[in-house]
């Protein structure tokens, strides 16, 4: 999903939406000072102080010692980007949830963090910084990404060379978090995933989640008080669940997740395309307890994303648990067919417990293109929002809904009239005054089964991740 960010005043580009994954490099005449020294990439040993072991592309040696590459930035309040957030856990991941950074970083008093990113080098030392997206969690703040906030790729195209190595630091490395309206009844859970390959494991308790570090340690912030089950999710990893008695304002530590001998399962299904020019989409498995019914999104564990999908799809090595299956969720000019009167249009749910599970096929249709705001990325607005989207060809009208960043409905108009002779439809917002924050408009086209009938058949809709705008 391609995104171009629009930034003004205090709005931070790290708040944007959309997914584009790039691998870029920056030219350098740097030579590895220990070019022929033996070093162990996995153990990170064999290099002198100030250097790290990296893989070498196309060289005589498979590894070499080089100055490190770091991604640096700040975690700040969304309502006051000058104020940093201390104690936030920041991790770099790829599009499938695998950890790209060497370790999770914890922000300092001013919100500053630094992530060491293992980076392949050319033989002359030129770094090819891998694509990565940032996730940040902090006590009392909504996780980024979550709600309407979708991770954007860090701009790794121009790493800055310094005496200590290479630094990636720009607007995309600043992460702004939304403060929760009420955190009084929340606590936290911490522990360790006791398994090899634990890095990136999604750990969930009470609908809240955290990500395990390379050594398996994890912290889940903002967990509702009560006795809760704690579970870990990652493709290919089976873990025993644990329990935690969470008290508001305190942390339950030592909640470790051991490897289980329970069999992994599988999820199989298919998609079909109706009235769609695009014929390739993606399918993801969302942990059910994290699913937001209003926004139709949630947390996807490492490795449980299938792309590209043009017909049948299959997830292997799926850990036990309850999942929501989403298709055509990403920006691909497609949406799940909104006509609930026919088969293959409902969101699928599946419980996995060691066997193969088949889910009903999805019908996918072409999306209504968003013109403004939020065509490519969250858009900062001045004044009353005016919504514009592509006209459908056979509609009798539209329904438009405005949601806030947590999925709460702010305003709805269910009788937007059809247009004739125009390529797009416009509608001025006429709801209550919007406070500062993120919002999304969604449009759905409909037609009447019979003229004057009360029942409606829904035809198409705007995409799940588009139409997002920012009120300053």
What spans do the regions from the language model cover?
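Sec-dependent signal peptide recognition
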Residues: 9-17
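N-terminal secretory signal peptides that target proteins for export/translocation
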Residues: 1-8
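Long luminal/extracellular ectodomains of secretory-pathway precursor proteins
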Residues: 27-460, 465, 470-472
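C-terminal motif of bacterial Sec signal peptides marking the signal peptidase cleavage site
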Residues: 22-25
């Amino acid at each position: 999903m391609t995104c171009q960010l629009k930034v003004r005043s205090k709005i931070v580009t790290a708040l944007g939406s959309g997914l584009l994954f790039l691998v870029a490099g920056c030219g350098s005449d740097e030579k590895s000072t220990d070019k022929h020294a033996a070093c162990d990439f996995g153990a990170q040993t064999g290099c002198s102080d100030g250097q790290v072991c990296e893989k070498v592309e196309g060289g005589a040696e498979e590894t070499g010692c080089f100055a490190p590459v770091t991604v640096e930035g700040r975690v700040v309040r969304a309502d006051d980007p000058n104020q940093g957030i201390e104690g936030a856990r920041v991790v770099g991941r790829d599009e499938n949830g695998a950890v790209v950074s060497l370790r999770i970083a914890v922000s300092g008093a001013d919100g500053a963090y630094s992530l060491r990113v293992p980076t392949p080098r050319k033989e002359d030392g030129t770094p090819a910084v891998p694509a990565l997206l940032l996730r940040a969690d902090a006590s009392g703040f909504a996780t980024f990404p979550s709600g309407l906030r979708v991770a954007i790729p860090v701009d790794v195209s121009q790493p800055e060379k310094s005496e200590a190595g290479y630094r990636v630091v720009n607007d995309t490395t600043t992460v702004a978090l939304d403060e929760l309206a009420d955190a009084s009844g929340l606590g936290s859970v911490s522990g360790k995933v006791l398994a090899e390959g634990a890095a990136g494991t999604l750990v969930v308790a009470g609908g809240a989640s955290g990500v395990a570090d390379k050594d398996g340690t994890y912290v889940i912030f903002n967990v509702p008080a009560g006795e809760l089950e704690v579970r870990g999710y990652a493709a290919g990893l089976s873990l025993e669940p644990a329990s935690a008695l969470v008290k508001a304002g305190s942390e339950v530590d030592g909640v470790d997740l051991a490897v289980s001998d329970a069999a992994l399962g599988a999820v199989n299904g298919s998609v079909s395309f109706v009235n769609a020019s695009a014929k390739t989409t993606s399918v993801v498995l969302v942990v059910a307890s994290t699913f937001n019914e209003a926004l139709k999104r949630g947390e996807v564990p490492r490795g449980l994303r299938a792309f590209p999908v043009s017909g049948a799809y299959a997830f292997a090595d799926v850990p036990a648990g309850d999942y929501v299956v989403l298709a055509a969720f990403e920006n691909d000019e497609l949406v799940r067919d909104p006509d609930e009167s026919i088969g293959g249009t409902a969101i699928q749910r599946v419980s996995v417990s060691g066997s193969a599970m088949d889910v009903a096929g999805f019908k996918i249709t072409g999306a209504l293109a968003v013109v403004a705001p939020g065509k490519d990325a969250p858009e900062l607005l001045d004044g009353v929002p005016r919504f514009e989207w592509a006209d459908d060809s056979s509609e009798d009208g539209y329904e438009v809904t405005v949601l806030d960043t947590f999925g709460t409905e702010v305003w709805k108009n269910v009788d937007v009239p059809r247009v004739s002779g125009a390529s797009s439809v416009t509608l001025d917002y006429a709801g209550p005054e919007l406070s500062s924050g993120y919002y999304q408009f969604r449009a759905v086209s409909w037609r009447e089964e019979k003229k004057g009938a009360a029942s409606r058949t829904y035809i198409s809709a705007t995409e799940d991740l588009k139409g997002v705008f920012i009120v300053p």
